[in-house]
């Protein structure tokens, strides 16, 4: 009864779900890098690591959007203003689309210089990185909304499914198509689309 009483507490249940989900996702990320490092070798994995670093660097501002959306949606939820939540998400999504529409061509134009700087053998690695950043931006919007709505089960499910497909698809493409960091990126992009679909 004591345990069931604790589980009925929204804060305890939400914290437990988030902790368990984050642990599984981090574990999946660990195995992702461990397996890919073994499969790709130092040169290809080094290129992938450099592109992942570029992704994280460009995506730093996304954290601010995460906090803003979560705070706004949670305030609407506490006031039972679901229509406001939908309007707000639609408004932010429109802004994200406009920013992406303007930024993507600019980022693509910078591909050549970044490719030379990182000593990559293909411009597609940079282009796939920009696609991943835009997807990350959109996914963060809807996952932040799930946090604000206290729908931690949906949030964690989306994250776990995305990580699972990221590992499976990336490894599968590398093994059956070719040992290239580009195949790992393609697997990541497809997994992100699946994660976005679950979050919606």
Regions found by a protein language model. Give the residues of each.
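N-terminal membrane topogenesis motif
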Residues: 1-28, 83-85, 90
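Alpha-helical transmembrane segments of multi-pass membrane transporters/permeases
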Residues: 15-25, 126-132, 146-171
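Small-residue-rich midsections of specific transmembrane alpha-helices
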Residues: 22, 28-32, 49-77, 96, ...
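Residue-level recognition of pore/gate-forming positions within transmembrane alpha-helices
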Residues: 22, 26, 53-56, 91, ...
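Helix-terminus/linker motif at the lipid-water interface of multi-pass membrane proteins
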Residues: 30-44, 115-116, 172, 177
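Interfacial/gating helices of multi-pass transporter permease domains
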Residues: 33-56, 181, 186
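Alpha-helical transmembrane segments of multi-pass membrane proteins
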Residues: 97-105, 109, 113, 117-142, ...
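Hydrophobic alpha-helical transmembrane segments
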Residues: 126-127, 156-200
């Amino acid at each position: 009864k004591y345990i069931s009483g604790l589980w009925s507490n929204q804060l305890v249940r939400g914290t437990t779900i988030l902790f368990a989900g984050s642990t599984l996702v981090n574990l999946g990320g660990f195995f992702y890098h461990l397996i890919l490092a073994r499969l790709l070798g130092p040169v290809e994995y080094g290129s992938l690591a450099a592109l992942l670093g570029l992704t994280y660097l460009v995506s730093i501002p996304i954290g601010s959007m995460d906090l803003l959306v979560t705070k706004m949606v949670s305030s609407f939820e506490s006031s039972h203003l679901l229509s406001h939540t939908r309007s707000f998400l639609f408004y932010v999504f429109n802004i994200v689309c406009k920013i992406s529409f303007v930024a993507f061509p600019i980022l693509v134009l910078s591909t050549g210089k970044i490719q030379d700087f990182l000593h990559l053998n293909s411009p597609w690695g940079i282009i796939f990185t920009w696609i991943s950043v835009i997807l990350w931006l959109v996914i963060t919007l809807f996952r932040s909304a799930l946090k604000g709505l206290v729908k931690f089960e949906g949030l964690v499910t989306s994250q776990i499914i995305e990580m699972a497909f990221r590992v499976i698809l990336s490894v599968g493409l590398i093994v059956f198509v070719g040992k290239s960091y580009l195949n790992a990126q393609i697997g990541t992009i497809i997994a992100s689309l699946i994660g976005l679909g679950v979050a919606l």
